[in-house]
């Protein structure tokens, strides 16, 4: 036996349930026009089975009970009136008699309507071309089906008409597939029986097609009414994405409270409900059945509000109306107005829950002469409004030109219209429209859990704190959202009571109760509209419509009734008295059906006032709530409260105004007097009805003794709480910024909760797409504009790692212009909404097709095939190499920092479905200032990206970066890493490996293509040794590169070597050799650059122990052999090399992360030295405007420790400190922290180019010092020229191993002097050198016999000459003049500007923190030097070593660092905003110095943050002062207005008194005159 259902007596709808009730249903033709005056509505008993996802309409309630016994779910009845099926046919029969000898469609004559007929009901899928017979189920006509047998009148149809067709399904059984195709329409009931014998006319093929193809013919006779296909019809709601439910505006169907079920095989049906609450519950139940988990997913809610006001410059004496279309779909229609002196509609349209649209179209029509039967309406023109123009916070009001499709006539008029296309522009017809499109990004409801809890517990404190600082519009929005949210939570009464009590205590004056615009009044208005709309219509519809339809005149002001007699004035006064009495009687009688929710709320008001001892204010408060804020405004403007559909006439408006004025005076318990003395004839009515008014207020504010059971229509569960919480998040985030900091702390932890939600939106909570839910990228800004991002759901791309697959769904956002980086789209520049930026929609959208911001999407389809091929290759290559890390978890959300300067920049995740990217304010993935979090994209899929050129002047500065914490967490979770990608686009062609931050003219093609499997092999973290390896891409030397880009473009011509390598390496745009591409003959055999700081220690020890220098050539040869052997060994072991991890900033303030490394370069960017002598594979310095030039001078060198020893020491250091690696340095503080955490195991690094403001990094500080120390040991002379001027935005740098970075891009390399800000500080270092000086860049002059690149020899003669002169000037500060056995000078020079010197150190402890030698005391080192050293200070080697005064050097360094410390303290704010221009110094760090430096770095960062916070507080205080001043002025104005009103009233009273006195005086005068004549006759 089946299970029984039970009728739910509760006031809630639980899922799943059986929802049922009577509805008026209409199913219209797709081409139905206005020739049909009445729509075929009919009552049907509708049943929604939420568990089965079916929506069935029955002709009777009894038939619907056939399947009740088989279910065990609650039943909920929504209709208010139990009605029979046959009693309420409110229209003509739905099936009109068809004359067999005519071809007329509905209406009888004329056939199909002309092109000027306006479609009454259009579908949202009109492009499908639906055709159907009015007696058949709606089908989609397929032009490919031309079989005439499908359209023939079959014998089964004849049997149906005779009633002899078999009844196939049993009543009550579930019908799924058969119902969609075989059910007949329910609108065929009670149709006239058609005589089959009359069907004698032959029907053409075209007419048969029009009648419909497929499906069964419906019943044509009364005998077959009992068959199941004639008494029920079912809609399957399980078609996800194909079936939708939406409310329908009353102007479309001519009925209130309608909704539409669109999609599915049957097309569209319209349902009319008895009230708005009933309609909302049906829509909620249907949507819940379609998508039960919608509230737990990320979604977007779109709404549109429009006001169509007036038109001008249209031909007069015509009747006009407008139709509102959203993407060619009819959503509303205005009333018909006659053009006289003014053509004014003034109608408001609210379209909630609309899909994503592109264009708003307003079509203007006019009625033609009645004699013309065919064309009753003529198209005048249209107004097209792009959606992105009306997405601002406030509604946008504007005059729009009415444009016609006709070329010669802008009005589309006939010859008698009186206009032509040559009309002046001033006479162009225009339409005044105000509209606002709002898109709300809604996160899953669980994300708002803390926010909802806070609001429920602290709404009173929030309202009290925000009240003084927010405007009227914000009060209205916040109040409405809070009311809806609290009503859904069952706290509306308590919420309103608390906020109203606050308002009463603040105002104090009883006469001003609810007179202002406060949160309390706006919240009360929202609650009244929410719960009392049906009550308002039931109460006031009859008297208002009667007053509007009647032509009686109620004007009683003598000044406005000039020429009227006293009799007519009395008649008008009597008419007004009757209208007022009728309206008041309806209101008084309405207490019988007064809403229970409002009654409870008003009862709570009375109880709270009694507790406060203000019982005297109860009646005033309740009357102000119900009359001042609800009933009287509804009488005054009935169209705003949906009582009428259009504005009443001028006379009716005046009548309604007088009625509302009288009722409001009655509710205030006052009398007419003063300036409204013409209304004094109603004072007797006011006195008589005052008692009844008090009785009415008492009744509606008293809880009944026997409360009625809760009605299902009062259930508030249908309210979308996620939408209201999203709106409140946006509004409160904006409002809190207006508060002073002290007041903000009063609302703690509200700011923290709001920030968490903002981060959740930026991280990208799951978004519902066909492929699943995806993490969405977003910009650093939240949705005050809402919004919002432009997404296009696409297919998911897959990637197989080892034996598992993970899907990465994607989104597509609005592509940015190629000439700029847009950090945040303005609210007015929102663009097209999410989900509609597809090439197909853009081709149809004339407003966006030529927009440069969407060119990338128009090319998206052409690029998808190429991306799929590349990703397949990546997948195959990846399986060959294999993953070292096997994922065991789903991908987490992107971990983003809270700071705007540390949010991930444009992150691209490309898969076969399209391109995903986001807008960001910063240029690279970065961490917050404290380095606690970072933003690393992670994924298993190889991503191929589209190249795009960005203008260098639009590049924002790069933030400080720290990634070790996230890398460490992700490594523990076995998540591989994706490469950092700022606002750079990575090319999809494997051969092009260059930075894409600036325009380039070079040839992107390479001699040899790098395998596509290396597209993402840019950086890895070694699990065994804790080494974060950074893969550096090579440079392209083949193409001429003469652009202004300061970043090198390099290329590889190698083939794969087959070695397995790490698949996740951070690519920073510098040559790479750590993996599977090895070219033995290109390896540098003579590179002796150290791999880490331990190599420097070896050099120091070696310099102390050996007093005799070896010959230069011999040493260089031996060292080259050692380094050659030491390099080949680690090259075969993937993941064990320490590359240049510290100079990670690329040009233009961006970090370019390439997925195509060029392994032709050596594994260290500072180790190659003889590349210039080896062939044509040298990578030129493609610098247009270099400020850094490293001059190579070949010569003698000293040997460093072998690479094997270096690798062992390096691995030990990495095992000890690997868990705290911070591989990317973005600033001085972050770089120091990275250096300390890494345990000193850093490599030599390069000075990377930059074209933004200066920001020196301690990462390069150390790494360049390593290069300099090694370079001091050999005969290679490096010159680090830095010439920076204030505001300079171009500087370049190169690797210390400048031999393989040879040629400059054909530009002048002369250093620019800095004028008065120039400062030259020269620190000399000998061979081995003092550790205090080793870290500085070396500057040497060219020596004879040493190899140098010809470009550098040509470009730098002046610099070399200046260098030699400065060497002579600063000899006394040089540590050792003799550098090596060669005949080269090793005097070191460092030239700095004061602007850049401030970033070298935070305090004097920097020297102690990084120089072990200086910490150990004033120990002097005996330095050996050649007798041939140029410009030596002493006559012999021993004399030169003894003459070195290290104490003076320490003092000089101390003074310099103190100066730099003061400079840093003075310019901290500028330091924070500076970009990533790097110039590094390095000294070996000791343990004590490291601790001191860490503490100093933290204190410095705290001071910077404190100063920034102080500045922000000052700005907020200024804003608060301005706001308070403005509020004060507003209050003064309001008070003055009240005083003026009081004075006006006093003047009126005085005038009345004077008038009375005058009348009395005149009366006395007349009496005296009557008595005076007898007395004056006596003297005569």
Swiss-Prot record:
It holds the Pfam family RasGAP. GO terms for molecular function: GTPase activator activity. It is found in: Cytoplasm; Cell membrane; Apical cell membrane. It is a peripheral membrane protein. InterPro entries: C2_dom, C2_domain_sf, DAB2P_C, Ras_GTPase, RasGAP_CS, RasGAP_dom, Rho_GTPase_activation_prot. Residues 940-954 have a biased composition (Basic residues). Keywords: Cell membrane, Cytoplasm, GTPase activation, Membrane, Phosphoprotein. Residues 197-223, 764-819, 857-892, 904-1023, 1112-1218, 1284-1313, 1334-1443, 1561-1580 are annotated as: Disordered. Residues 1363-1372 have a biased composition (Basic and acidic residues). Residues 776-805, 1140-1150, 1186-1206, 1396-1415 have a biased composition (Polar residues). It comes from the Eukaryota. PROSITE patterns: C2, RAS_GTPASE_ACTIV_1, RAS_GTPASE_ACTIV_2. GO terms for cellular component: apical cortex; apical plasma membrane. Residues 233-291 form the PH domain. Residues 490-700 form the Ras-GAP domain. This is Ras GTPase-activating protein raskol. The gene is raskol.
